[in-house]
């Protein structure tokens, strides 16, 4: 209901300010409120994988840890404070959720959950078909445990950080 007739402002933390941090973005909340913004849509905020990384900074859609934040942006506590301050100022916070794939070195792979990914005939984790996707690994939504872990990560961000929703 709170999305009806709301003004949504998309934010890429890395490019929003010279510092590219949650703290620097938080300082601009009053200006965004004056502009009439109601909902802040944050582009992916998670740590970016290292394996097959594209460029120096990597692809923010190559998520390494769904419960973490990109350390370039600050700490999880910095993010928590940003969300709290945004709520005080009347904003809702939604996150661009990367649900189809993760980085090939996502913590789930390190924990031995290779079966949470689509595998090729040799048992190797697959990148999505088509395009230049070598920096991401396609998730296997037929695996119930993976779906539960994905939901758990989303619940964590809602219950522990107070995020309002996901795109």
Question: What does each of the following model-derived ranges do?
Answer:
Residues 1-7, 14-23, 27-38, 44-165:
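Substrate-binding/active-site clefts of carbohydrate-active enzymes
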């Amino acid at each position: 209901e709170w999305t009806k007739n709301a003004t949504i402002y998309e934010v890429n933390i890395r490019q929003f300010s010279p510092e590219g941090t949650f703290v620097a973005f938080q300082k601009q909340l009053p200006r965004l409120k004056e502009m009439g913004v109601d909902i802040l849509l944050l582009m992916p905020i998670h740590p970016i994988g290292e394996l097959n990384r594209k460029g120096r900074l990597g692809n923010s859609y190559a998520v390494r840890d769904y419960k973490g934040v990109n350390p370039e942006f600050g700490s999880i506590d910095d993010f928590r404070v940003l969300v709290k301050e945004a709520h005080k100022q009347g904003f809702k916070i939604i996150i661009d959720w990367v649900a189809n794939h993760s980085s090939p070195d996502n913590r789930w792979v390190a924990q031995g959950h290779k079966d949470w990914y689509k595998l090729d005939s040799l048992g190797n984790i697959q990148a999505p078909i088509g395009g230049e996707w070598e920096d991401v690994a396609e998730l296997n939504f037929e695996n119930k445990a993976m779906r539960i872990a994905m939901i758990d990560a989303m619940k964590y961000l809602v219950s522990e950080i107070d995020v309002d929703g996901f795109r």
